[in-house]
Amino acid sequence: MNAYLSDQPVRLSPLRDEQGNQPRFGLLLEPGRPGMHVGELPAQWLKGLARSHHLLLLRGFAAFADAESLTRYCHDFGEVMLWPFGAVLELVEQEGAEDHIFANNYVPLHWDGMYLETVPEFQVFHCVDAPGDSDGGRTTFSSTPAALQLADSSELELWRRASGRYQRSAAHYSSRSAAPIVERHPRREFPILRFCEPPVEGDASFINPSEFHYDGIAPEQRGELLASLRRCLYHPQAHYAHRWRSDDLVIADNLTLLHGREAFAHRAPRHLRR
């Protein structure tokens, strides 16, 4: 379908994965004329779409020349959080990385701001340079409401009893976080999941993992908890893996989704700004 903004059409269609499957969330926006800039789309309109569809992919638009212009754009969405590294995180592989975020490791599912007092409502990703199709590095998103809908009654009962405690020391912070696995959206009250996924057990190559503890369940139920969460969060109806193209802009509902990253080839030209 088309939406008309300032007499210029924007094409809207459901987001689909590379196999053509349509998850229960996500919307693709494409320009209706050549050279249309992302900044021509009203931020309030995009925020409404993001709250309804949880993940927006803006593809084919002219985008941002630098981090400063991306930051100015993001101010239209609300207050921009200032992290220890500034407003924009440059996600690019670093030689001798001391944290998995800056390596070419996979990154398990998590939510941003989990160690902060205020969790940002939205994330904005801009792809400066995309890796090759065979290089890996897709960003993964999982809808927690969809996962809750996919769970059976015994899984839901287990999730509702469980809570997670996490501790992490990274380049920019060291902190602890605790949250029940099943929680209410902080603004809209519907159920969501708050889950920080551990890395693959026994993976010695994973750089600087967090510490993970789960309360409210018996120790022998930890494996069942993790397996059931992964089953639902990685179900095709709840999960989307995004292969980047240069100048893609992705707006994610950070209060509703979890996100992560697939591993990518060493020195692949993968550069995102978030």
Task: Show where each model-derived region lies.
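Classical protein tyrosine phosphatase
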Residues: 69
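Active-site environment of non-heme Fe oxygenases that use a 2-His-1-carboxylate facial triad
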Residues: 1-37, 51, 92-246, 251-274
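Beta-solenoid repeat scaffold
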Residues: 77-85
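Short Gly/aromatic-enriched secondary-structure transition segments
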Residues: 72-75
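Structural motif
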Residues: 60-62
